[in-house]
């Protein structure tokens, strides 16, 4: 836990009774009766979205704390994903996009180019910052940005807003349905002048099942519930399984795509 955590409370979700945890050396301890609990914390610039279920036995549960502080970074024209020897390198595209936002480019002269190393990046990416470019500098190899959400299903990792949430993915407490047909990459209306070059955008939903999707607890649900169970052996490319699932959603003006592939099945 962060050093800034000064109080932890576990609230019984049935009767709202509050239990206070004893905090010591970045750990916590308390006694709870059977039930489901929401965790609330006093943690400075951090917050947690966590739940614990107690059923007749001791429970050990690490809590995920995420910073609420708005990061500011000095602007640089180039950042990298998957290039470990490079300065300003990030391990995921999502982290790189977050860094772009922290640099806050205000016009074309402050454009940030995200150089993405060839490989598979299984993550939902939301771009809400203007003047950002995604580029694959090795076009003979593929940069694949892919994700698995689709209409008619619920997933643990979807937050209340309908998009991937790191906190919800870790908590695995309740499921939600996707917005924008589960777009693998969503260029929001604030992301003016987005560019991509030599990138493949893919929705795997109607193509193949991933271990990550199964681990995310995919189940039929939502207002457009689909009467088809998605399992390791399911033929998700069949007509029976096909549903709306977008590889790319674009609302930002002046978006440009060069030598890109956009791959899905229904409503790409």
Locate the predicted segments by residue.
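Short, ordered, surface-exposed loop/turn motifs in non-cytosolic proteins
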Residues: 1-21
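Short, surface-exposed beta-strand/beta-hairpin micro-motifs centered on an aromatic residue
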Residues: 24-32
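A short, solvent-exposed beta-strand micro-motif common in secreted/extracellular proteins
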Residues: 34-44
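Structured interaction patches on ligand/partner-binding surfaces of diverse proteins
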Residues: 44-68
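Detector for repetitive beta-architecture
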Residues: 78, 111-113, 118, 124, ...
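Acidic Gly/Asp/Thr-rich repetitive segments characteristic of extracellular carbohydrate-active
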Residues: 78-115
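Feature marks extracellular polysaccharide-active and adherence modules
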Residues: 82, 99, 117, 128, ...
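Extracellular beta-strand-rich solenoid/capping regions of secreted or surface-exposed proteins
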Residues: 98-106, 122-134, 144-195, 206-227, ...
């Amino acid at each position: 836990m962060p050093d800034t955590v000064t109080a932890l409370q576990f609230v019984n979700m049935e009767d709202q009774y509050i239990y206070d945890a004893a905090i010591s050396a970045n750990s916590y301890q308390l006694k709870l009766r059977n039930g489901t609990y929401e965790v609330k914390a006093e943690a400075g610039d951090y917050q947690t979205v966590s739940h614990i279920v107690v059923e007749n036995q001791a429970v050990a549960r690490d809590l995920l704390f995420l910073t609420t502080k708005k990061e500011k970074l000095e602007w640089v024209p180039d950042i990298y994903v998957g290039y470990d020897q490079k300065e300003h390198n990030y391990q995921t595209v999502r982290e790189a996009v977050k860094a772009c936002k922290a640099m806050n480019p205000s016009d074309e002269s402050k454009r940030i180019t995200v150089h993405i190393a060839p490989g598979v990046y299984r993550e939902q990416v939301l771009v809400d910052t203007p003047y950002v470019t995604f580029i694959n500098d090795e076009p003979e190899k593929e940069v694949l940005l892919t994700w698995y959400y689709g209409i008619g299903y619920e997933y643990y990792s979807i937050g209340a807003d309908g998009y991937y949430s790191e906190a919800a993915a870790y908590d695995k407490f309740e499921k939600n349905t996707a917005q924008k047909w589960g777009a693998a990459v969503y260029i929001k209306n604030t992301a003016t002048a987005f560019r991509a070059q030599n990138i493949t955008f893919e929705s795997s939903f109607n193509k193949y099942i991933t271990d990550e999707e199964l681990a995310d607890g995919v189940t039929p649900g939502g207002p457009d519930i689909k009467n088809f169970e998605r399992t390791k052996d399911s033929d998700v490319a069949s007509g029976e399984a096909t549903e709306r699932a977008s590889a790319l959603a674009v609302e930002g003006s002046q978006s440009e795509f060069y030598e890109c592939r956009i791959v899905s099945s229904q409503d790409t």
